[in-house]
């Protein structure tokens, strides 16, 4: 893609030139995992000379390493939004969500008031075996105080993760105590899950939620499908809402389970990468089952590959809102110091031939696209969706569009009927999350005895958690507005209770609770009940009469 931009000669650009010279010269004259850098030498000589001039004559000593680290992200950002540089330190955790496991202590945590709070402890993991409990506050790591502004997600993960069988000493404060407990945890392999929920929506409909597409997503899906088969499911909903993508191969494996032999799943093509087709091999076990795929504005990349394959082959119905629109393929390439880049090398195309990548020539517009769509009303009305890309056709002849995500077959607007400014402030301020953590800590002993989401829901309603939240919010700057609270009562109660359920139980229980009155789930069940999950061919145009 040609991207003509005016470039001013600024210190940053000089740094970029230096880095390019470095890459051409001796500083980075090594391999990307066996792949040599190919850079045009005619330009390289000039830039390399510039590097030597700066190194020889610049008024101050130049730290070449610092220039590299600062300028690499800027270089790649000139290409596209998804080509990125990852430092060696960040590279340790960059792919943890997509790997089948990582080495750590086995906790889920949040950071509140500059302190790590243990949200959940993974069963039979290193932290649980050592005695760490949900609700603990971690204030020391290896005898060093770890609270305050330095406590970030990245820094916390860097300190808590580490090689298997190494030890980390934690200083924790337990709820209701003042004294620091010291606990030594031996790090171990922690499994990561992509399939975060799997259960029966009703007597016939199975439901699977996929958070991302990692190394183990396909086997996790097969296990979930096998369990649903034991329950006798005869139709399936795959929820990709909020799924930001992952490995293309994982999406292809899953699509293969539902498509017939020879059907195209996706193809990729780039300037240096010839077209490569990925087709179903006919061995999938669920080629005939009625299928619905749920997407929203956060569904991206590999999630869009799966949704596009199902839609273009008319294999099932897509329900939700228009997806993100990421149709670029990145290849990881590692430097000798273990830093790496993810470079866009190709685009992917759905079976009908459409590239669903949204335009990115204007970086500011690209980053602001989500808010632009929101303000334009696209989340609330299907008529507000603008199709600027070319039209394509599915196997049955239905019209679909490229250039900006997967548009669902059935649109589900964001629910704003009972939304008020009080609700928006309560959610956006983080007060609901803060209240949920506080309430959980204060009632953990009682709540932890409940293993069933519906038992917990009944209990929370009996405790009038909404009123408790309103009092908490009033004390923390969000003044009570009774009329608005009454109008948004259902939304507020749903949000408050869902976060408490998540804190105590797990993501499966949280998903089940939210799905019970989810408009997209309700529409899915209606579609299956009416036998309309398989898209039909467009009706022939009615004859004209004169």
Predicted regions and their residues:
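Cleft-lining beta-strand/loop regions that shape enzyme active-site pockets
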Residues: 2-3, 27, 31-43, 47, ...
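Extended, small/polar residue-biased N-terminal targeting/export presequences
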Residues: 58-119, 165-197, 515-525, 532-542
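Hydrophobic beta-strand signal
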Residues: 139-140, 266, 317, 342, ...
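Polar, glycine-rich mid-to-C-terminal structural blocks
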Residues: 302, 314, 321, 325-390
């Amino acid at each position: 893609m040609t991207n003509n931009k005016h470039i001013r000669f600024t210190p940053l650009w000089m740094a970029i030139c230096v880095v390019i010279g470095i890459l051409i010269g001796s500083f980075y004259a090594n391999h990307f995992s066996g792949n040599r850098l190919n850079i045009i030498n005619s330009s390289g000589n000039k830039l390399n000379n510039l590097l030597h001039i700066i190194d020889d004559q610049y008024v101050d000593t130049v730290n070449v390493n610092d220039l590299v680290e600062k300028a690499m992200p800027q270089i790649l950002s000139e290409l596209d939004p998804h080509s990125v540089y990852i430092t060696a330190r960040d590279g340790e955790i960059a792919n943890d969500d997509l790997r089948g496991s990582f080495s750590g202590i086995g906790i889920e945590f949040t950071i509140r008031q500059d302190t790590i709070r243990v949200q959940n402890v993974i069963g039979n993991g290193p932290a649980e075996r050592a005695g760490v409990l949900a609700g603990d506050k971690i204030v020391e790591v290896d005898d060093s105080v770890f609270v305050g502004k330095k406590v970030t997600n990245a820094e916390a993960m860097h300190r808590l993760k580490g090689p298997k069988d190494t030890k980390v000493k934690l200083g924790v404060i337990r709820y209701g105590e003042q004294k620091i407990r010291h606990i030594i945890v031996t790090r171990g392999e922690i499994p990561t899950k992509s399939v975060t929920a799997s259960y029966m929506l009703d007597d016939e409909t199975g439901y699977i939620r996929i958070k991302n597409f990692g190394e183990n997503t396909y086997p996790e899906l097969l296990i979930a499908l096998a369990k649903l088969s034991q329950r006798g499911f005869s139709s399936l909903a795959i929820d990709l809402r909020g799924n930001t993508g992952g490995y293309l191969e994982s999406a292809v494996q899953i699509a293969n389970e539902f498509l017939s032999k020879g059907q195209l799943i996706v193809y990729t093509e780039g300037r240096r990468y010839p077209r490569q087709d990925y087709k179903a091999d006919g061995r999938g076990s669920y080629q005939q089952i009625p299928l619905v795929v749920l997407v929203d504005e956060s569904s991206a990349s590999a999630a869009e590959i799966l949704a596009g394959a199902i839609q273009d082959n008319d294999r099932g119905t897509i329900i939700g809102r228009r997806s993100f629109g990421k149709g670029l393929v990145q290849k990881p390439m590692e430097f000798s110091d273990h830093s790496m880049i993810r470079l866009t090398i190709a685009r992917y195309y759905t079976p009908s031939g459409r590239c669903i990548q949204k335009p990115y020539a204007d970086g500011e517009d690209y980053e602001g696209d989500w808010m632009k769509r929101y303000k334009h009303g696209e989340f609330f009305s299907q008529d507000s969706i603008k199709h600027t890309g070319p039209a394509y056709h599915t196997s049955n002849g239905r019209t679909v569009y490229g250039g900006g995500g997967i548009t669902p077959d059935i649109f589900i607007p964001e629910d704003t009927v009972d939304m008020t400014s009080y609700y928006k402030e309560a959610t956006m301020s983080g007060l609901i999350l803060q209240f949920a953590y506080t309430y959980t800590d204060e009632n953990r002993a009682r709540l932890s005895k409940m293993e069933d989401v519906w038992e917990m829901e009944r209990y929370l309603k009996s405790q009038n958690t909404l009123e408790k939240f309103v009092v908490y919010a009033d004390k923390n700057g969000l003044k009570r507005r009774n009329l608005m609270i009454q109008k948004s009562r259902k939304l507020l109660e749903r949000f408050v209770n869902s976060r408490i359920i998540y804190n105590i139980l797990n993501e499966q229980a949280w998903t089940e609770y939210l799905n019970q009155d989810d408009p997209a789930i309700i529409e899915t069940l209606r579609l299956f009940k009416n036998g309309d999950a398989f898209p039909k061919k467009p009706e022939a145009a009615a004859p004209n009469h004169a």
